[in-house]
């Protein structure tokens, strides 16, 4: 065998794209041992010529065969000349026939090289011969060899063919009808809607959307032959969603691709933070090309079929609010209003309940089209539904709702019997990790508080806002409620009892919540009620803080409650010893106990600069925290009043003419 150690002239000439029969005939006829000439890649003369990009001349092939060049020679890639020729861009039926050879193997079995022809490669060529397809598939029942490239591109014959520049419907139809033949070739990689992979429609649209050469005949042929318009790719997109990325949209093609499709259905894109769907993608600039254009005729077509109002709402508001096409949204709402004004009201409710980013202009557009904020749907006002939205609540949206007659919801329980703010509190503030939202919650409360008839309103479970704030251990919100007048002594459910349980779950400053509540002086009855219930706690500090407070109210407190405090005899002994110290220490004939716990803050202010009062805490061990807080507050208030008096006396005014002691007395009454 004559392997070319240097470039073999005849083989190199056969690879030239300008080679012709006239030019090469003499060289072939005069070449010595042409059948022995092999290049470094293992190609013989036939390999070289049929791999040439030129228009293959059957006369040259016949001439090479007549000179003994082997049809069955395999090159380094394992390909015979037939296998190499099947990758040509313009395969000819007659040449394939010439290159096919039958032979007997070592077992004397009749074999053929027919399976070397790579149908996958052939289907990607520009010129498909239907006769050749029928010959290979029907007559010869061709099967893929190990050298076919299906494993590389992963596509079936139909999938490959539709990606060619100009697939012909008649070829496509024949391929689709030939799936029944047992050849071993894959015709379509995605056969069923449940496969969740691109089907032939996806590939056709994807490969032709830039060239704008989509054919209605090809699309119709695919659809009519069981290529499903309902098939979804790996990300969940339908063929019609691929079509939206074309710069020109043909409504007739749209009609073909959406028949019986739920065009308003939406889903979450797992690869990116977007809500996707047929209508949603059509309206979203992100999934369209420039120039962005929305045809209301197509929009109407998309919302004519079956749909739910939730899906319609999510479709038209699924994208970035900075890119909303308000004109289109307004037209869609007008269309529904013409059918029934209650539809727009339902869309408002659904938008507030499910919208991933509620936009005030969209809400205003819904109001302009007949929706209202003061109408209930299933016993819920719109504000109720907004507060159960799983996405972040926008303070500005809340303000817009209540300022547009949505404030009525504030004094009504929702359809599940809960307070208006219940969903807002529970959905995001049910563990310490969400306390970054406290500012939003407090800002929302500040807006709603102006409309509240009763801050201690109870829901169907006899729970108040303060109870819920304590239940979710939201100290800042509880503090704001107390500042606005919420009653720590609410009798419906024990707030103190709940605080003991929830406070003990905090890793740091375990008594902060109960300290806040106790600073608002719950009554003895409230404390008794708390300890008459089942008490649960993880750490004892909140419980002990409440016991200390209750003993100040009544030394005999332990005997008046069901909860067994007597087991903590050591703590009780210590607390009572501190109380006795306070009762036996006097200033101006008044016991420290009375000054600290019985008299008013105004009375206590008189002792703000008294060293005995200020230093008293040093002799107290178990009530040190409580006394330090009281004395610090008293001194701070005293300094505040002194500062006010100093400022008053810098000007000539009526109060400045009064003696300073009287000025202070007047200011004392400003302290509760």
Swiss-Prot record:
SMART domains to which the protein is assigned, alphabetical: ANK (SM00248)
UniProt cross-references to SUPFAM superfamilies, sorted A to Z: Ankyrin repeat (SSF48403)
Domain of life the protein comes from: Viruses
InterPro entries xrefs: Ank_repeat_dom-contain_49, Ankyrin_rpt, Ankyrin_rpt-contain_sf, PRANC_domain
Pfam annotation, one family: Ank
ANK repeat locations: 41-74, 77-108, 196-231, 235-266, 282-312, 344-375, 378-410, 461-490
Alphabetic keyword roster: ANK repeat, Repeat
Protein name: Ankyrin repeat protein D4L/I2R
